């Protein structure tokens, strides 16, 4: 049973002895320490000193008595803690200065060796924190010895690894051979380093988790503390409020007590005065009894007279009060009747006004309904008219579109017929040309010369007339290939660029030639030649005014159509003139190209044999799609040349030198012509580009003009809509003003001719009724009030007699009650006086007793103070006797510290602690301990 309190006391002693650790140790987060880190060595020194001190105190704790150490732990002051902190800070600064100087010297000398020793330093980092795991001093010493051995072994291994065993020359020879099949050996330190890294990461993760948990706990604790503070503040506030209320209640009670005391004092004074008066009356009563008999009769007479006088005064007063009461009653009755009549008049006028208001509202609703019917009828008529016009416009638009489509369809049919006819003529011409070429290739040209000549003439007759008249019927497209008549003669399509330009320009030419049936048939084509885009454009342009015409008159619409058609005719005339110019340019270009082609064929025919010339001439003849009048002579010349060559093949085989010179001159002339043709061609191309640019500008201008017209139309439409809206607003405003004027007119009529005379009549009737009512009231008063007055006088006399009798009875009762009250009050005063006297007596005895007790307690306190001083002296002497043992323990501690310093010096050879600082630290510790023991 006695062991538990002893264990508890020992644990308290230990906590008290180790309290200085909590004050001196500064919390800091654990970092990964390196072997060259200053903080690492400082921590190790601190840990060693802590272990030494704790071990020393724990071993000697059982020998020391309980009470002095309890006093030491309990009486520790803030001054001792501050002294210890200052000493500790000075020691730490000394260690930091020494380590900084040492590290600077080592870093200046060993900059190159740092890169080599990174692996070994990394492996030592996780081991730096291992000393924190040990809780006992012996385990820590063992750990330090093992660490020292491991560092020496590691240094020896590094020395052996970096030692040069072989000369440099031998290493060079060996290196040449070993470089071929050299393999890197695995270093076990890398695996160890990885393991250390993993351990370090795990430790950091655990530290982070612990830090997070600690933060959460602190947050919870802070929240709990805040809640507690709020609760305490609320409790304090409530306590203060309750205290204030109690104080106010106390003040009120004090006030009430003072008031009660003052009242009692006044009552007492009154009683005293009454007693004095009664005593005086009792003294004078004996004298009055003698004269009482003489004055009784006189007093009775006086009393009788006084009573009569009082009765008269009472009667007069009662009469006055009755008169006033009657006046009040009659005035209230008259006022009530007047109010009732006024209410009836108001109700009548209100009912009449409501009837008139109903009539006016009904009349207004009727007029509004009539007006709405008229407006709806007009609106329906407008809508019918607008729908009729819209239907007519839509029908007219549909007919116009159908007519336009029908005319377009007719144009398209005519164009298709012309295309078919042209295709048939082309087929016939091709067949004839094929027959001619076959005959020429088979040598039957002489037999069928006349037919061969007639065939080209027919072809030229078919194709030529439109060209002579300055117009072109149609040109075959580029993808049409002529049929192959034979394998010797290949018919190629016309040239891509020139024929394409020519075809494009010729297709845009309007065909109009009076006098020829063919041209009459071709005259149907012009609307279709500009392309489907123009037709679509015209249809869309026609459709726009038709859509707009729904909102305008037909006459204006027709005028606009006529103006637009005139503009379109002018534009078409301009396009026709431009197309004619383009056609002339194309014809000139084609003629130049054809001439250059003929000269090329002639030069080739002169330079090459007959077998190669014939197909090319055939090909050139076929490739010329449209024959101009200037090229007929060249064709006849080419035919004559062909026939002459067939007749005289021997001469061609052996040409004369003159002929050669002529051929050369012809070639030169052809070259010059070709150069001129190219120049002309370039000029024509430039002109064509200019014309195209002008055409594009013209189209842009037309598009801009069209956009401007559309914008103008939109603006006109918008203005018309604005005007219509303004007109509608004006109409609505006029309607509103008319309605307001009508209402004002009706109100004026009602006020001037209806309400005001009716009000005058009502006022006159009210005045007459009031006069009649007043006259009738006066008559009733005269008739009934006299009888009522007599009855009231009789009842009043009877009541006065009863009242006098009742008054005398009440007076008797009051006198008796007051005498009884007076007796009870006297008894109460006597009782209170007795109680007060007893209280004074008791309080006086209690005061004497308290004074005696105070004197006794003061003497006892002085005795206790002397006893406590004696006990303190005894305790101090006893602790002084134990001081010898304490000094022995301090010496043992100092020896332990010396051992630790030696170990630190072994770890750090250059470390030296100044003796003065160490002695000062020791003296401060001993001084603080002795001071606490003395206290």
From Swiss-Prot:
InterPro entries: CACF_protein (IPR052270)
Keywords: Coiled coil
Keyword Coiled coil: yes
Keyword Coiled coil: yes
Superkingdom, taxonomy of origin: Eukaryota
Coiled-coil spans in chain: 189-324, 366-438, 554-589, 660-740
Transmembrane segments annotated in the record for this chain: none
Protein name per the record: Coiled-coil domain-containing protein 191
Protein's organism: Macaca fascicularis (Crab-eating macaque)
Gene: CCDC191
């Amino acid at each position: 049973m006695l062991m538990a309190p002893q264990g508890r006391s020992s644990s308290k002693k230990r906590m008290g002895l180790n309290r200085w650790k909590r004050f001196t140790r500064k919390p800091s987060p654990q970092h990964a320490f390196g072997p060259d880190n200053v903080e690492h060595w400082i921590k190790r020194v601190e840990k060693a000193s802590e272990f030494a001190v704790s071990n020393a105190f724990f071993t000697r704790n059982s020998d020391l008595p309980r009470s002095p150490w309890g006093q030491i732990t309990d009486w520790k002051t803030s001054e001792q803690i501050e002294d210890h902190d200052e000493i500790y800070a000075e020691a730490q600064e000394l260690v930091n200065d020494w380590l900084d100087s040492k590290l600077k010297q080592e870093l200046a000398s060993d900059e190159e060796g740092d890169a080599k020793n990174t692996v070994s330093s990394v492996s030592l980092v996780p081991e730096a924190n291992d000393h924190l795991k040990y809780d006992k001093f012996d385990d820590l010493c063992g750990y330090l010895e093992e660490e020292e051995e491991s560092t020496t072994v590691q240094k020896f291994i590094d020395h052996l690894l970096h030692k040069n065993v072989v000369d440099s020359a031998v290493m060079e020879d060996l290196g040449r051979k070993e470089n071929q099949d050299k393999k890197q050996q695995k270093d076990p330190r890398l695996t160890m380093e990885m393991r250390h890294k993993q351990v370090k990461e795990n430790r950091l993760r655990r530290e982070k988790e612990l830090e997070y948990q600690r933060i959460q706990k602190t947050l919870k604790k802070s929240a709990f503390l805040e809640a507690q503070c709020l609760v305490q503040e609320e409790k304090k506030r409530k306590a203060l409020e309750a205290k204030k209320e109690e104080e106010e209640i106390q003040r009120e009670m004090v006030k009430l007590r003072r008031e009660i005391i003052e009242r009692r004092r006044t009552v007492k004074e009154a009683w005293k005065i009454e007693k004095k008066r009664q005593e005086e009356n009792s003294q004078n009563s004996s004298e009055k009894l003698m004269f009482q008999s003489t004055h009784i009769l006189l007093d009775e007479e006086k009393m009788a007279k006084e009573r009569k006088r009082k009765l008269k005064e009472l009667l007069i007063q009662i009469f006055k009060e009755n008169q006033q009461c009657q006046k009040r009653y009659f005035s209230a009755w008259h006022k009530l009747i007047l109010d009732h009549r006024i209410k009836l008049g108001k109700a009548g006028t209100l009912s009449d006004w409501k009837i008139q208001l109903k009539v006016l509202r009904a009349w207004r609703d009727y007029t509004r309904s009539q007006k709405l019917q008229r407006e709806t009828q007009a609106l329906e008529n407008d809508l019918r008219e607008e729908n009729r016009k819209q239907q007519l416009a839509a029908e007219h638009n549909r007919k116009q579109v159908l007519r336009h489509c029908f005319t377009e369809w007719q144009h398209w049919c005519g164009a298709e017929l012309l295309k078919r006819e042209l295709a048939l003529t082309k087929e016939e011409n091709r067949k004839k040309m094929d027959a001619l070429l076959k005959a020429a290739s088979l040598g039957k040209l002489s037999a069928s010369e006349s037919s061969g000549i007639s065939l080209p003439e027919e072809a030229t007759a078919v194709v030529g007339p439109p060209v002579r008249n300055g117009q072109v019927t149609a040109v075959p497209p580029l993808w049409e290939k002529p049929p192959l008549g034979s394998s010797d003669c290949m018919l190629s399509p016309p040239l891509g660029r020139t024929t394409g330009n020519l075809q494009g320009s010729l297709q845009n030419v309007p065909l109009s030639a009076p006098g020829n049936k063919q041209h009459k048939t071709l005259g149907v084509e012009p609307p279709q030649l500009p392309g489907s885009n123009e037709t679509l454009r015209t249809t869309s342009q026609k459709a726009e005014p038709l859509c707009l015409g729904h909102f305008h008159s037909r006459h204006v619409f027709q005028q606009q159509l006529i103006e637009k058609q005139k503009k379109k005719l002018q534009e078409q005339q301009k396009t026709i003139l431009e197309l004619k110019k383009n056609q002339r340019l194309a014809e000139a270009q084609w003629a130049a190209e054809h001439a250059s082609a003929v000269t090329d064929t002639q030069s080739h025919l002169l330079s090459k044999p007959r077998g190669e010339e014939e197909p090319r001439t055939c090909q050139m003849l076929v490739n010329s799609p449209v024959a101009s009048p200037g090229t007929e002579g060249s064709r006849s010349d080419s035919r004559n040349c062909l026939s002459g060559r067939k007749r005289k093949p021997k001469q061609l085989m052996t040409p004369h030198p003159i002929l050669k010179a002529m051929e050369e001159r012809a070639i030169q002339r052809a070259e010059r012509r070709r150069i001129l043709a190219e120049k002309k061609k370039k000029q024509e191309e430039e002109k064509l580009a200019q014309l195209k640019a002008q055409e594009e500008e013209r189209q842009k201008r037309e598009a801009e003009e069209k956009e401007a017209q559309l914008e103008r139309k939109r603006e006109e439409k918008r203005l018309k809509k604005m005007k219509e809206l303004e007109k509608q607003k004006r109409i609505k405003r006029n309607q509103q003003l008319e309605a307001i004027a009508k209402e004002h007119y009706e109100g004026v009529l009602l006020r001037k001719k209806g309400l005001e005379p009716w009000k005058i009549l009502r006022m006159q009737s009210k005045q007459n009724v009031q006069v009649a009512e007043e006259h009738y009231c006066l008559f009733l008063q005269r008739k009934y009030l006299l009888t009522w007055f007599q009855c009231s006088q009789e009842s009043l006399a009877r009541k006065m007699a009863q009242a006098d009798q009742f008054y005398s009875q009440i007076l008797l009762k009051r006198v008796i009650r007051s005498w009884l009250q007076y007796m009870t009050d006297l008894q109460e005063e006597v009782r209170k006086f007795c109680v007060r006297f007893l209280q004074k007596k008791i309080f006086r005895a209690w005061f004497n007793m308290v004074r005696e007790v105070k004197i006794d307690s003061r003497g006892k306190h002085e005795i206790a103070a002397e006893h406590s001083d004696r006990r303190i002296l005894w305790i101090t002497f006893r602790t002084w006797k134990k001081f010898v043992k304490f000094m022995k323990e301090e010496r043992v501690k100092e020896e332990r510290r010396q051992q630790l310093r030696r170990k630190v010096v072994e770890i750090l050879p250059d470390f030296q602690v100044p003796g003065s600082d160490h002695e000062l630290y020791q003296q401060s510790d001993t001084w603080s301990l002795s001071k606490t023991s003395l206290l």
